[in-house]
Amino acid sequence: MNNWDKIWKKRTAEIDHAGTVFETFKELKRADGFDTQDVDGYYEAFYRQWEVMAERIAAGCNERVESLYEIGCGSGVNLFLFSRVKKVGRLGGLDYSPNLIKIAKGVMPDTDLKCDEALNADIDLKYDVVLADSVFQYFNDVAYGQSVLQRMWDKADKMVVITEVHDQAKKTEHMAYRR
């Protein structure tokens, strides 16, 4: 893939999922690398962003989302919220980091989770919605992203959602900031 695998393979966390949904959400976001700022409203803003995304997905599916699969699910933060807040019955995900998949399985042991590259997503088992939230910028090139998008399309019964597709002209600046 690229050098990001070195970063993600080092991520570990013990998640106390006995707390509130919001507290678990914050811990999962931290495990995914959103731990660089600790200012008032930081995690609340991410939660509101998720709520908006979830409402748009629901509206686009006529309020009937029974299954959702996430490419690049990381620690499972989105899947966790779709399970607990939106009560989506069948969830699945795939991520490149074995440590993040381990965290996700610890919080959601009955979820279909796999450690693999995005391009290897199984398209035989369909889901209503297939989501890729802020992962396309980690792909090596446009051709890889196009191939992943095709697999997402083939896997989805109702909707494909891709968030945060970054401006290629600012890729170097963005990667430097994230490191």
Which role does the model predict for each range below?
Residues 1-123, 160-179:
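Class I (Rossmann-like) S-adenosyl-L-methionine-dependent methyltransferase catalytic domain
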Residues 82, 151-152:
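Class I S-adenosylmethionine-dependent transferase superfamily signal
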Residues 131:
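A conserved beta-strand element that flanks and buttresses the S-adenosyl-L-methionine
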Residues 134-138:
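Short catalytic micro-motifs in class I SAM-dependent methyltransferases
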Residues 139-151:
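A short, conserved alpha-helix within the catalytic core of class I
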Residues 156:
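Glycine-rich S-adenosyl-L-methionine
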